[in-house]
Regions:
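N-terminal hydrophobic targeting/anchoring segments and the immediately downstream early-domain regions
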Residues: 1-123
Length: 124
């Protein structure tokens, strides 16, 4: 069975708790995706604007992005097949992988009002 989990606070919770994308206490993780026969996990970078009102959102965004990239690299090094969905071609290929993730940035606090930051995040 293929499950798509759009519960987007996963990445934030992993960062705060220091837990892994592979096995955690959130609604869904990579381990459960594989056990169920496949899945897609949305991982949103959400900047709580009440904490980062005027600045700091970009730095927090980069911290979450770093956590995400490290988690994917660790899974890859262990030989675990996780597809990061980065393109339309990747999206079409999701069903051919045991697990997949889709990274998203939720709301504008992530860029601290900078279009340059937005362009650079897109490149990452």
């Amino acid at each position: 069975m293929f499950i798509c989990d759009c519960h987007c606070d996963t990445l934030t919770e992993l960062y705060k708790k220091g837990t892994s994308l592979y096995d955690n206490d959130q609604h869904f993780d990579i381990k459960r995706q594989i056990e169920l026969g496949g899945g897609l996990q949305f991982c949103a970078i959400f900047v709580p604007t009440h904490e980062f009102r005027y600045y700091g959102g970009l730095r927090y965004t980069l911290s979450l992005l770093d956590k995400y990239k490290k988690e994917l690299k660790a899974l890859q090094e262990k030989g675990i097949d996780v597809l990061p969905v980065l393109t339309k071609t990747d999206a079409a290929d999701v069903l051919n992988h045991k697990a997949a993730t889709l990274l998203a940035i939720e709301e504008g606090g992530a860029i601290d009002g900078s279009l340059e930051a937005l362009r650079m995040l897109y490149e990452l």
